[in-house]
C-alpha cells in the first residue's frame, strides 16, 4: 500500500476508534496497518544507516 494511503487509513481508524469504536475486523485491520507502517519505517532507517560512512 502507498505510504500516504496507509497513513490516511491508520488515521481514519484511529479517529473512528475515539468517536464510535471499532469492530473486531477494523481492530485487526488497524493492527495490520500499524505493523506494516512500522516495517516500512524500519526498512527506511536500515537503508539510511547503510549509507552512513565512518569518518
From Swiss-Prot:
Compartment annotation: Cytoplasm
Principal subcellular localisation of the protein: cytoplasm
UniProt xrefs under InterPro entries: DUF896
Annotated keywords: Cytoplasm
Pfam families referenced in this protein's UniProt entry, alphabetically: DUF896 (PF05979)
Transmembrane segments: none
GO cellular-component term (any): cytoplasm
PANTHER family reported for this sequence: UPF0291 PROTEIN CBO2609/CLC_2481, UPF0291 PROTEIN YNZC
Family: Belongs to the UPF0291 family.
Protein name as it appears in the record: UPF0291 protein CA_C2726
Lineage start: Bacteria, Bacillati, Bacillota, Clostridia, Eubacteriales
